[in-house]
Amino acid sequence: MAVGAVSQIHVSVSDLEASVRFYRDVLGVPFLFEVPGQPMAFFQSGPVRLYLGVPEPPEFASKVTLYFATSDIFAERERLAGEGVAFLDEPHVVNRDAGGELWMTFFRDPDGHHLALTQTRPAG
């Protein structure tokens, strides 16, 4: 088993409103949604989701985060943990909508870059 394709990329921004205008209105990247009460905006660039966010708490702060799609987030997390990967959190739901629930769990590569596993699961 291996992680799937990159499904999402996170870019830290200093001004979310200005960045949304730039990516949506100047570059024309299709806007998906903002998270109410959170400094986050999401776009769809072909098969890859782009996540713009104002820096988070220190343990999650990173200039870039790669998100890897997986068909079973729990099994893949267990496999990677068996390979010595230390996770920063447990798999958890980050968004619910008509398409289902978006689950994530975060870890780091050897240089400290943030990586995540993602899975869209049926709502329920």
Model region roles, listed by residue range:
Residues M1-A18, V64-L66, T118-G124:
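N-terminal beta-strand motif that seeds the catalytic metal site of vicinal oxygen chelate
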Residues G4, H10-L50:
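Core segments of cupin and vicinal oxygen chelate
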Residues L16, L66-H114:
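Vicinal oxygen chelate
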Residues P30-V35, H92-N95, T120-P122:
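Conserved catalytic-core motifs of GNAT/GCN5-like acyltransferases
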Residues P36-P39, F60-A61, A98-E101:
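Short acidic/glycine-enriched loop/turn segments that link adjacent beta-strands
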Residues P39-M40, P55, H92-R96:
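Short, solvent-exposed loop/turn elements at beta->coil junctions and helix N-caps
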Residues F43-P47, F107-P110, T120:
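Active-site beta-strand termini and strand-to-loop segments that position acidic
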Residues L50-G53, L115-T118:
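Conserved beta-strand in the GNAT
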